[in-house]
């Protein structure tokens, strides 16, 4: 009886606070060193801007994405020059220690001809992405799709079938719109468009399987530019088949707007257990800024507790209770130090990516938050004596005084990393 009551209490507690993420079971797709789906960690992707007119410039951009943590990097395959550059790109990445199969070729209507004209160059690709809505037009669309799938089968290359809201097959849309119009109570147009996305993706995947591409070589995506549509489409797609799924908004925009929109959609789906690989599609302000989309992907995954890439620093926003300039300097110094040391620590102290550090500005929440972190430092607040309480694994370690509080705390951080994760 007690056991039944305990189970009931646990169920009630989970219904109130929310249980842990239950991941959808999808078919595993291997791309070089990474596995998409099958319960593997969510894979981070990006796409190179390319098109600089200088191969060396494009190579450095792609290398920058890899160094930032992109595990798969998509490049446009839209010309003879672009497909002939694939071996050079792969060679450049491999020479820096990266996977020889991390480059994904993305083509449209011209991709079938390019794959068949330059088969040896294209064979360096780890994955191919095609959009069934613009791989060709009319009868040629089906022939091109079949040609790409046959190439992938011959060279044992996985394929992402990526359907986009803005480039859906017009014949399919027309049929679904006509069917909807004949209903006594037609659905809104956006609902029909959602159905068209899912239908196009599933029909294309089924066609690829009939041609001979194994299920464990297929990844699907159905991208929209609006968060609600994205969530609705992927919810329906995830219930319809077990293909591995690639998440992302097709056009998120620039800056803060793009980051918030992408995070809202991707995080929502990941918390539902939907999604095996993600890309944040931000409009870059410069070639150097392209790696921002990789950083956002990593922050989404880390904030949800799905993957850990770096030690996490928690800090309060500051208010009238804090000595803000001093507190700001402390937060900035701790963040800068951890960022600078992380690449070294990840090699010599691999568990450090799970470390949490709290930097708090006053005694209201400072001690409590500091106790919840591996390491925490709490300032007393504005107008108080300039002392800082330091906590280690939930217990008060010491109190720092004077002008070198930051330096002394960083020494404590360094010592802790080597003791805890050495």
From Swiss-Prot:
Positions of [4Fe-4S] cluster binding: 316, 319, 362, 369
Name of the gene encoding the protein in the UniProt record: ispG
Enzyme Commission number, as recorded: 1.17.7.3
Keywords assigned by UniProt, alphabetized: 4Fe-4S, Iron, Iron-sulfur, Isoprene biosynthesis, Metal-binding, Oxidoreductase
Cofactor binding, per record: Binds 1 [4Fe-4S] cluster.
Lineage: Bacteria, Pseudomonadati, Pseudomonadota, Alphaproteobacteria, Rickettsiales
Name of the protein in its database record: 4-hydroxy-3-methylbut-2-en-1-yl diphosphate synthase (flavodoxin)
Segments traversing the membrane: none
Enzyme class: oxidoreductase
GO MF terms held by the record: 4 iron, 4 sulfur cluster binding; 4-hydroxy-3-methylbut-2-en-1-yl diphosphate synthase activity (ferredoxin); 4-hydroxy-3-methylbut-2-enyl-diphosphate synthase activity (flavodoxin); iron ion binding
Pfam families found in the cross-reference section: GcpE
Cofactor(s) for this UniProt protein: [4Fe-4S] cluster
Family in the record: Belongs to the IspG family.
Pathway participation: Isoprenoid biosynthesis; isopentenyl diphosphate biosynthesis via DXP pathway; isopentenyl diphosphate from 1-deoxy-D-xylulose 5-phosphate: step 5/6
């Amino acid at each position: 009886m007690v056991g039944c009551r305990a189970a009931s209490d646990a169920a009630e507690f989970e219904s109130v606070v929310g249980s842990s993420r239950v991941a959808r079971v999808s078919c595993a797709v291997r791309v070089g060193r990474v596995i998409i789906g099958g319960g593997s960690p969510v894979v981070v992707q990006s796409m190179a801007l390319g098109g600089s007119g200088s191969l060396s410039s494009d190579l450095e951009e792609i290398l920058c994405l890899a160094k930032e943590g992109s595990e798969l990097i998509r490049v446009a395959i839209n010309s003879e020059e672009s497909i002939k550059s694939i071996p050079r790109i792969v060679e450049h990445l491999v020479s820096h220690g990266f996977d020889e199969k991390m480059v994904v070729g993305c083509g449209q209507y011209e991709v079938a001809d390019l794959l068949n004209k330059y088969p040896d160059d294209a064979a360096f690709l780890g994955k191919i992405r095609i959009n069934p809505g613009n791989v060709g037009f009319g009868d040629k669309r089906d022939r091109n799709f079949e040609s790409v799938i046959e190439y992938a089968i011959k060279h044992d290359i996985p394929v992402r079938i990526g359907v986009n809201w803005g480039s859906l097959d017009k014949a399919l849309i027309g049929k679904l719109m006509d069917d909807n119009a004949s209903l006594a109570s037609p659905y809104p147009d956006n609902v029909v468009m959602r159905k068209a996305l899912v239908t196009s993706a599933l029909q294309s995947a089924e066609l690829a399987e009939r041609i001979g591409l194994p299920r464990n070589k297929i990844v699907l995506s159905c991208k929209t530019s609006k968060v609600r549509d994205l969530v609705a489409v992927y919810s329906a797609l995830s219930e319809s088949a077990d293909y591995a799924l690639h998440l992302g908004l097709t056009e998120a925009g620039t800056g803060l707007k793009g980051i918030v929109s992408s995070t809202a959609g991707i995080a929502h789906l990941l918390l539902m257990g939907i999604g095996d690989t993600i890309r944040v599609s931000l409009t870059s302000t410069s070639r150097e800024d392209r790696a921002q989309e990789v950083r956002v992907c990593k922050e989404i995954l880390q904030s949800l507790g799905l993957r850990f890439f770096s030690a996490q620093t928690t800090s309060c926003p500051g208010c009238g209770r804090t000595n803000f300039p001093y507190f700001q300097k402390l937060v900035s110094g701790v963040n800068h130090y951890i960022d600078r040391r992380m690449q070294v620590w990840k090699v010599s102290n691999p568990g450090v990516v799970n470390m949490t550090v709290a930097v708090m500005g006053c005694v209201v929440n400072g001690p409590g938050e500091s106790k919840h972190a591996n390491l925490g430092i709490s300032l007393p607040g504005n107008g108080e004596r300039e002392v800082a309480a330091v906590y280690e694994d939930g217990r008060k370690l010491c109190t720092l005084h004077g002008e070198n509080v930051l330096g002394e705390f960083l020494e404590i951080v360094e010592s802790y990393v080597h003791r805890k994760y050495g």
